[in-house]
Amino acid sequence: MMTRLLWAASLALPLLQLHAQATLTPGVARFVSVNAPVVALTHARLVDGTGTPARVDQTIIISGAHITAVGPSASTPVPAGAQTIDVAGHTVLPGQVGLHEHTYFGGVKRLTQMSVSGPLLYLSYGITTGMTAGSQLPYQELNQKSAVDAGGLPGPHFLIAGPYLNGGPPRNAMSRNLSTADDTRRVVAYWASEGATWIKFLGAESRDVLRAGIEEAHARGLKVTGHLCSVTFTEAAGMGIDLLQHGFITNSDYVAGKQPDVCPAGNMRVQADVDVNSPAVQASIRTIVANKSAVVSTLGVYETFMPDRARLDPRAMEFLEPETRKEVEATHANLASGGLIVPTRLLQKMMAWERMFVAAGGLLGAGCDPWGTGFLPGIGNLRNYELLVEAGFTAEQAVQIMTLNGARILGLDARIGSVAVGKVADLMVVRGDPVATPTDIYNVVTVFKDGVGYDSQRLRDAAKGKVGVE
């Protein structure tokens, strides 16, 4: 019923420009807790997204959809008539920018779209912008984006990558397999005309296909990302790929005997025994950085394939439909006998590789990659924060990776990604201090998108039991 009401209302609304304030339908307005012409958040602890140390007792002024003042509470005047919200004891951060998001739930017997639950969960946990890194139902995602942007569906601003593009034997029933450069150019051109702004490649395409896809996408103003295998990271970087997914674990540069245009069977496993400090690995990092290809960290989803670390978060399990929950619980119980197993040493090497990539000047973002191991939108993004801190980044650096760096990768950093005057008021208000206590990051109270504050608990309540259904 909720799906029908929200989508029916959205169809009557015009598509509005990204980051403009939309007129909210009653179905969306019921999730809103703050919606005033001028809002003052006072006495906040502020992590601004730039990587600089957190500042205490700060005031943020929001006028319409934008931030108009940021500074110490003692010296930042609150405009007359503003709705003033004392957020002492809370931390304000930029809205997160996710770079590996999905609105379908896979890895279980019945793949389903998260047409309502996905946007609700993403927004409830502070993700205000997300790039869908591959779609099973691309037209559903395009329509979903239109509904969100028009104010008919609560959720983040989405950038759509269209369907998965691949090569060789089918690895995904809903991917488009490509064997020639000409065919690739035609398909990329088509999805550009349909509204995709990114293109996502999977792991079996040839170098010629990937090169053609990158060239055609760039000629049309689109960017390209990939979960690669048959083409190595350094090969793709040399072609000008914009964004490489998952980092060390998927980089087939490190597979001995790798054959051109072939995805080696041991990829994502042999990396566990690769010396991450070796000259070859260091050289590959330098090549990726020199070619200005960014990387997406997805540490959290791979942790769910680790028998010694994986856990089912009770908060996430509440959002699963009962039959889907049983499947996820069964998968978890039998994890050690499953397919992909990530040993602890591999996760540690993934973390080390990401630190070295950033130290070398690389641009690192982050994304969720929801999956049937119980790794869900929003809450999975926040697990990445904890793991980035565990990896050795400061809390402020981890926030930067998940916010401003993501905005830079998307080309939106002039508008979003940090808490600064003139930027869009995309913010998350968190109870506690996630700098001192990383687990506090889950205590999201209010999420501002385009200057409108959404009640996180109301959003989460509406998503309970929905993943696996809608």
What are these language model-derived features?
Residues A44, I60, A65, G89, ...:
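Divalent metal-coordination and catalytic microenvironments
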Residues L18-A22:
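Boundary at the C-terminal end of the N-terminal hydrophobic targeting segment
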Residues V187-E205, T250-A391, K466-E470:
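Active-site neighborhoods of metal-dependent hydrolases
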Residues V28-S33, L46-T59, P72-S73, L376-I379, ...:
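Acidic, glycine-enriched loop/beta-strand segments at the rims
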